[in-house]
UniProtKB/Swiss-Prot annotation:
Pfam (any one): Proton_antipo_M
Record's keyword annotation contains Thylakoid: yes
Organism superkingdom: Eukaryota
InterPro entries: NADH_Q_OxRdtase_chain4, NADH_Q_OxRdtase_chainM/4, NADH_UbQ_OxRdtase, ND/Mrp_TM
NCBIfam families membership: NDH_I_M (TIGR01972), PRK12561.1 (NF009212)
Top-level class of the enzyme under EC nomenclature: translocase
Name by which UniProt lists this protein: NAD(P)H-quinone oxidoreductase chain 4, chloroplastic
GO cellular component, as recorded: chloroplast thylakoid membrane
Record-listed E.C. numbers: 7.1.1.-
Amino acid sequence: MISNVPWLTVIVSLPIFAGLMIPILPRNGNRVTRWYTLGICILEFLLITYIFYCHFRIDYQSIQLLETFNWINNIHLHWSLGIDGLSLGLVILTGFATTLATLSAWPITRNTRLFYFLMLIMYGGQIGLFVSRDILLFFFMWEIELIPVYLLLCLWGGKRRLYSATKFVLYTAGGSIFLLVAALTMSFYGSEVPSFNIQDLIHKSYPLSLEVLIYVGFLVAYAVKLPIFPFHTWLPDTHGEAHYSTCMLLAGVLLKMGGYGLIRINLELLTHAHFLLGSWMMLFGAIQIIYASLISMSQRNFKRRIAYSSISHMGFVTIGIGSFTETGINGAILQMISHGLIGAALFFLAGTCYDRTRTYLLDQLGGAAISMPKLFTMFSTLSLASLALPGMSGFVSELLVFLGVVTSNQYSFAFKAGITVLEGIGTVLTPIYLLSMLRQLFYGYRFFDKSNPYSIDLGPRELFILICFLLPILGIGLYPNLILSIGSTEIPSLPLT
């Protein structure tokens, strides 16, 4: 579908240009900067919603709202944007999560202008990545995230923030090298004039050995972001030290960039290599679920416990994509959106607990259920959502991944049975570490009592943020077609099934 207005360029550019305007805002405290940034985020989300309702056709199974402009001719880089069901779902998630993360950052009082500037730059870069139709532009948007996250970690992180930020940069930059080499190889192979346009690259073919090498190059970059075991070790350190509003963006959006790349590039452009390596992806995804769950159970720091739970849940995304079935891929897409909501909400809850106690150590906490019933109720409800309680979004997504594995025609019965058993063990381990965390936080001895100055229950702003997360979690769980009716339009053809 073609529109006279370049809507995608507008939603990519608006946060970036709005962020560049922050230095000229009045310097009379933090209030103006806060409300300005929140207003931009709300405006951006309203524009995304408008585009979805007025310019996007769910029944049209192709890229819509295409925009292509020459940008840098010397390197054949085009400003090429387009949107389909996969990208639209993640764009909506990005707008929703970023708006609530901005509101959650209200207590920050140090260098607020720089903080909100970095958040807006991240916002524009994430939207740009999900709508890119040029593989070099995709890489450019991929790299935009690096500096804002590094600075957010360094300036507003915990005691080990420099170590965590450096580790994040090394992992991400290392993966980006593989991504760039793979993208250049794909674009230059067999062409006198290189083309980075994804639509053109769909029709290119490669020798199988070269296709596998290109696939692995992309996979390494995505394995860092997603993350996939064993490239995950940056994530617990980063989440453990970052401010909780930054964690909301990391868990809610940043991790989904890897899953999006696996579907958009590896599955769509490198189908034969994906068929060959899909079983390995499923195996590593299953190992990741078990491994991260076991490590999570041993964490005394409950923020790191939530971080390891994120790694475990993203294993279902890897399995769903590797299943090579439409059901499994739909489950992976739904799991990305579901975890984006649940993970961001849990990190916000972890931050609200820290604001009151100044500690993340479970053995120093307990007894909060009586003095803070609202916090207890929301933490319990969202933890149940994380362990895939029926009626919540996580249940539907994990069920679809299970069904995708079982119904796949590409793998032997023994292999599918083994993956299914490992997934089942993971779903059993999840309530163990989550319910144990709830018990240590809210029961036990009375750290929180009526005389304790930290025993302050959730305020209106915090309740509003959590309810905003909870409503779509329940909505998707009760009526998953809210997402599947959008996401199913973009599933690439699977000629080998």
